[in-house]
């Protein structure tokens, strides 16, 4: 199978940015905490009234700064953990794609100036085309009125619409040919289903069954591979 891109590359970069930011905030919180302790001790030990007041004010300000930095550090490190899980899900889908005997696959392919990249584009073994959005979760998946749930958790945004939009963009790149829109939740435990808009929702285990439904849009495997190569080379850096 011809492959381009790196599965989970975008969210991995996000993870490292969040980790770096979280580490800086954590270091700032530690520095502010030490400053606060020193200033408050000074307020207790100093003899001059004005100096004691100044030290106390500085200590309170440093303590407030410590609290703010700690909150930001916790938030950034939480975002880093979520990005790490998202990258892992995209790699799970890549593994599933490699088992489907597909002709070509691209990971993180940018299909337009808006809407971000498509997690995975696949040209199937039947010479069909699919745009896959990857979401994270384990349990029963349901979708209704623009909301998708995995177990009791509501996924952010509208994953089915995201997949449909990416499929539409890919279709335009392919001259209006039909593209299957898919949301893949690797840990989904129920059977594949379609939303009211015709977007397929499936687990990594059932991905091949769903991809086999993509109608043929290429005359031969070599045409599909060359098309993927051209799409990747033409995509914005």
Where is each model-derived feature located?
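Active-site ExK catalytic segment of metal-dependent nucleases
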Residues: 131-147
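Surface-exposed interaction regions that form or flank ligand-binding interfaces
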Residues: 1-116, 123-129, 140, 150-237
